[in-house]
Design a protein with these regions (language model features):
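A long-range scaffold signal marking pre-active-site subdomains of enzyme folds
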Residues: 37-448
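Bacterial Sec-dependent N-terminal signal peptides
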Residues: 1-41
C-alpha cells in the first residue's frame, strides 16, 4: 500500500491578499477494504478471467453541487468538474461568477496482481469509460463486516465474482442526496411522535414529503438476490436489528448529530456521512471493458460521497469528497496507488503553475503573475488571482505492522512538538511532518 493518511491543512497564507479567496478541493479521504486479502483463487495464472455479465452502458447521471459558494459538476461514472458535453470547465468559484478554477477531475487507481499484471482504472477527460454505476456481486459470509459494531484493521468485506448485470448498472445510475438538517429534524419528529422525547415537541412539524421520500428511499441495502452486499449506504440502525426501517427511527447516518459521537475515528473504520449536504453514489470498474485506459479491471466497488458545508469562513469556498474502496474480487492487489486527478485552470489556463507543499501534503495551482487576463473566451480572475489546492485529509490506512509508527507529537511536559529522526521514520513506516498523517505516536497500534 502506498498512501499515508493526510491531516487537514490550514491552507496557504492568504494574509494581505486583497479580493482573494483560497478554494480547496478536500475530502479525498479514502477507506480501503479487503486489499490485503489472499483469496482462494489468488494463484498463479488466475488473473485472466473474462468478466461475466459485463455489458453495462456508460453511466449518465449528473448533478451540480451548489450548496455553498462553489458550483461543482459531478458525474456518476467517475468523472467530475468538467462539462463534457460543452467541453468547458465546471468548477465555478465563487458560484455565479462565471469564473472557473478546475477543468476536469477523476479518481485514479491501480496495482498489480500476484503475477505482476497491471490492473488499472482511471479517467482524464472521459473519452472512454473505466467506471460504471452500481455495486458488485459477492458471496455472502466470506467477510466479517458488521456496521453495527466498531471496525478495526482486521475486518474483511464480503468478496466473490465481483460482477454486475446491465440492469443493475442502470438501476444505480443515480445520486442519493440528503442534508444533515433534514436528518436532525426527522430524528426530533420521530422521537416526539414515539414518546421518546416530551419536551419541546409542541411546535414540531412533520418532515415534508420530499424529505420523507429521500429518507425512505435511502439505499441502505443491496439486493442479496442479485448477489449484492446487504449493507450499502451508511444508515443509523436505531433498534439495531440489522435492517433499515425509517418507521422504527432508522435514517441516513451522520454520526455527529444530536450530541452523538458514534464513531471514534482513531480506532473505528466505519464510514458514515459527512457534510451539511451529501450526495452518495456507488460505482465500479467491472461493468464493461476499460476503454479509457484499456487496463484490466480490478473488481473495485467505490462508494462515493461529494459533500459541502455552508459556513461564514473559507470552508464555504471548498468542496469535499470521500471514497470507500472495496476490493470485491478474490485477487489481492499489490503495489497499489490511488490518486485524485485534477486538471486545474485558474481562469485563463495559459499562465498557471503547479506546486507542492510537502509538509502539508498539499498540491496546489496558482497564477504565474499578479493578473489573470481573459483570453479566447476564457474569463480570467483579474488582479490578485486566487490559488486552489488539493489535499488528502485521510488516505488509506497503512498495512498493519504491530507498531505505533513514529510521527510528530506534542510532549505533555514541555508542551513542545517532538519530531522523530528521518531514519527512524523511514525504518518504521513513520512520518516527520505533522500535516501529512494521523495516528502516529499516539500510543495506539495500527491506526495510522
Amino acid at each position: 500500500m502506498i498512501f499515508k493518511e493526510i491531516l487537514e491543512i490550514n491552507g496557504l497564507n492568504v494574509t494581505n491578499m486583497k479580493k482573494q479567496f483560497f478554494a480547496t478541493i478536500i475530502g479525498l479521504s479514502i477507506t480501503l477494504n479487503g486489499l490485503a486479502y489472499l483469496g482462494p483463487n489468488d494463484k498463479k495464472g488466475g488473473g485472466d478471467e473474462t468478466p461475466k455479465g459485463a455489458n453495462c452502458s456508460p453511466a449518465t447521471a449528473k448533478l451540480t453541487m451548489e450548496f455553498n459558494d462553489v458550483s461543482a459538476f459531478i458525474e456518476q461514472g467517475g468523472s467530475m468538474l468538467q462539462n463534457r458535453q460543452e467541453g468547458t470547465p465546471a468548477y465555478e468559484v465563487p458560484k455565479g461568477s462565471n469564473l472557473f478554477a478546475i477543468y476536469a477531475g477523476a479518481l485514479w487507481m491501480g496495482g498489480t496482481d500476484v503475477n505482476g499484471q497491471l490492473k488499472l482504472a482511471a479517467l482524464r477527460y472521459r473519452s472512454g469509460n473505466d467506471f460504471w454505476a452500481g455495486p458488485l456481486t459477492v458471496n455472502p459470509g466470506t467477510g466479517d463486516y458488521n456496521p453495527l459494531y466498531p471496525v478495526g484493521d482486521g475486518v474483511r468485506r464480503d468478496f466473490g465474482e465481483a460482477n454486475i448485470d446491465p440492469d443493475q448498472c442502470q438501476a444505480y445510475d443515480k445520486f442519493y442526496t440528503i442534508r444533515k438538517a433534514e436528518v436532525v429534524a426527522f430524528n426530533i419528529w420521530f422521537e416526539c411522535n414515539a414518546g421518546i422525547a416530551t419536551e419541546g415537541c409542541d411546535d414540531i412539524e412533520a418532515p415534508s414529503n420530499d424529505v420523507l421520500k429521500r429518507i425512505y428511499g435511502w439505499p441502505a441495502h443491496g439486493d442479496v438476490s442479485r448477489g449484492q452486499d446487504y449493507f450499502l449506504a451508511p444508515y443509523y440502525d436505531r433498534d439495531e436489528d440489522g435492517n433499515y426501517n425509517p418507521d422504527n427511527g432508522d435514517h441516513p447516518w451522520y454520526d455527529d448529530i444530536l450530541g452523538r459521537d458514534d464513531v471514534l475515528c482513531q480506532v473505528d473504520r466505519r464510514v458514515t456521512l459527512y457534510g451539511d449536504e451529501t450526495h452518495w453514489w456507488v460505482f465500479n470498474d467491472k461493468g464493461n471493458i476499460h476503454t479509457e485506459t484499456t487496463g484490466d479491471p480490478i473488481g473495485m466497488e467505490i462508494r462515493a460521497q461529494a459533500f459541502s458545508f455552508a459556513t461564514n469562513d473559507e470552508v464555504n469556498l471548498m468542496t469535499f469528497y470521500n471514497y470507500e474502496l472495496i476490493n470485491r474480487g478474490t485477487q489481492t492487489l499489490y503495489d497499489t496507488y490511488f490518486s485524485q486527478y485534477l486538471d486545474c485552470d485558474i481562469g485563463n489556463y495559459s499562465d498557471d503553475y503547479v506546486g507542492c507543499d510537502v509538509s502539508r501534503g498539499l498540491g496546489y495551482t496558482y497564477n504565474g503573475d499578479l493578473v489573470d487576463q481573459s483570453d479566447g473566451g476564457t474569463n480570467g480572475y483579474g488582479e490578485n488571482p486566487p490559488a486552489i489546492g488539493c489535499d488528502f485529509f485521510e488516505g488509506p490506512y497503512q498495512d498493519a505492522d504491530g507498531l505505533d509508527n513514529p510521527g510528530p507529537y506534542l510532549d505533555s511536559i514541555t508542551n513542545e512538538m517532538v519530531i522523530p529522526e528521518i531514519s527512524d521514520a523511514i525504518n518504521n513506516n513513520g512520518i516527520v511532518y505533522n500535516g501529512i498523517g494521523t495516528g502516529y505516536s499516539d500510543d495506539l497500534i495500527d491506526n495510522e
